[in-house]
């Protein structure tokens, strides 16, 4: 079982069949002194079942590019995930980075980009 609680970065789970499940993070910033209340993050308990898990910063979806020179957006990012058709973490991250480079074209990178893809080992019995 994987326990996840996030702030501003959703966790995505990708099955061996390529199905994507989103576990939403709280829309809450971390580490700012002016925040009075501590984060009350919702916890998700997720069966591992051979899934690949993915965390990605918003620098991907906010990247300008494409023929229309618009932000990539979450719909296009979801399409890249569907095109990848893999639950192998390395292949998935490489596929997403290729898709980002194609989308970006000659545009400048607007923000930092981080993709973390991992597959936990099956639980020992």
PLM region spans:
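Conserved subregion of the PPM/PP2C metallophosphatase catalytic domain
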Residues: 1-125
